Every structure is written in C-alpha cells, then in structure tokens.
C-alpha cells in the first residue's frame, strides 16, 4: 500500500519536542525526511543516553523515538562547504520543517 506522503521530501531543521514530533509524523506517513544536525549532533541525542534501559548506541530513547524513519546528515553551517551542502539540500527537498 502506498503511503500518503510517498514522494514528498522534507528537510528537518527541528529540535527538542514539537518540531521533531511533527516531522516524525511526516516520516511515518511516508515522507523522505532528512534531519540536518550540527556536526556534534543534535542536543537531544544525549537525553537518557547513559541509561542502558533507555538507550541504544549512545542515543537516548527520546531521540530515537522522535527521529525514527528519518535520514540524518551533520552539516557545519559555519563553513563555505557546509553552507553549499545545505543550499543543495534545500533545493532538492522543496519542503522545510523548522522550529
């Protein structure tokens, strides 16, 4: 069965709760969702990361849950190369989620 948002590409610049939750729903509905993070990773990666019952591979359950079904790329927007990559991502995505 084809998903409702199959063929839609979203560039996800969100962090914390409401933004990642919204883009999680888009990804769950079939949108190709590309999360853009700083080179050191988005801050919520570490929430619960030290709890073995609530973490996997250094990422907490909070981050894993809200970012399921998404692709991820780390970009340093302070460099010329990083900014060029970001502009390329914006061009191919056509849809942007940010909070």
Residue ranges and their predicted role:
Residues 1-99:
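N-terminal helix-loop segment corresponding to the beta1-alpha1 unit
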């Amino acid at each position: 069965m084809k998903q409702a948002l199959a063929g839609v590409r979203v560039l996800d610049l969100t962090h914390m709760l409401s933004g990642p939750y919204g883009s999680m729903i888009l990804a769950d509905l079939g949108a190709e969702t590309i999360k853009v993070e700083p080179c050191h990773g988005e801050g919520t990666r570490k929430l619960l990361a030290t709890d073995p019952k609530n973490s996997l591979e250094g990422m907490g359950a909070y981050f894993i849950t809200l970012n399921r079904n998404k692709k991820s790329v780390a970009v340093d927007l302070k460099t010329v190369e990083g900014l060029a990559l970001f502009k390329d991502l914006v061009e191919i995505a056509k849809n942007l989620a940010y909070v």
